[in-house]
């Protein structure tokens, strides 16, 4: 890696922006930031909550000078696109290709991520297959590495909305990303899970289970109301 490189650059939405509640005392940080820490590289994150692929192109790309050069460019987008009623696979794929092209102009390596199949409440269902096919096609055209998150979704790794990763979920994504990058020749200096420390007790587990059950019920009722309103 050249000394003039600027480290890791990340485009995306709230998942890549990070931030949120502690989990067993562990801060919720972006998976991309954990990747940068694992690679011992500087991090530049321009992801914005609620972003869609169009927002990446219009708002995020212009924030990074065209002459800048990074070791790794990360793109995780599509969750907000695919959950909209006006979802358009062809338009998304064009936008995703353009976003990867913008990263390629600035980065030595590219990494993009697919979307978990069990996405959202109500579920996005078949549309998730479409967004993942678009991401795969875009990545192949750009020569980007792909982190497959289709099966991602363990209870302690995803919030009850089945969209946003927990603090442990962000770390789990980063660990998988580092596996992909290591296989491609990048030097992983430290594993994110070794950088955290937490302690659980019977009472804290019970409180956590109760909170999870309450939030899951709220989410289920909200999803049911959405379905009823759509009828």
Where are the language model's segments positioned?
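Short, electropositive, low-hydrophobicity segments enriched in small/polar residues
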Residues: 16-18, 22, 54, 82, ...
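Generic detector of short, locally flexible boundary/turn motifs and exposed helical patches
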Residues: 9-14, 38-41, 56, 75-79, ...
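Structural motif
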Residues: 51-60
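Cell-envelope and extracellular/periplasmic
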Residues: 15, 46-51, 77-82
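Serine-esterase "nucleophile elbow" of acetyl-processing enzymes
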Residues: 1-47, 61-69
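Alpha-helical cap/lid subdomain in secreted, periplasmic
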Residues: 3, 34, 59-231
